[in-house]
């Protein structure tokens, strides 16, 4: 009867970050070369807002931090795969 919230949160944050990357991938790939665009900025903003609401309790914002880490990891992986395929 006991559920494992850690497993649920990690799979749900992975789903969120993959769907978030899909939403911003087109915008990122179509930007000009000199323009900086961080597809994970929404997750960064959410984690900062959480820290402002809960200044003394980082544990309350763990899911936001993990979602940002997952998004950033996926973004960098996609970026590496994209640059290695164009370099060939």
UniProtKB/Swiss-Prot annotation:
One of the GO biological process terms: mitochondrial respiratory chain complex assembly
Key word Cell cycle present: no
Motif window: Cx9C motif 2: 61-71
InterPro entries, per database record: CHCH, COX23, Cys_alpha_HP_mot_SF
Localization per record: Mitochondrion intermembrane space
Cystine pairs: 40-71, 50-61
Cited SUPFAM superfamilies: Cysteine alpha-hairpin motif
PANTHER family noted in UniProt: COILED-COIL-HELIX-COILED-COIL-HELIX DOMAIN-CONTAINING PROTEIN 7
Described function: Required for the assembly of cytochrome c oxidase.
Protein name: Cytochrome c oxidase-assembly factor cox23, mitochondrial
Organism: Emericella nidulans (strain FGSC A4 / ATCC 38163 / CBS 112.46 / NRRL 194 / M139)
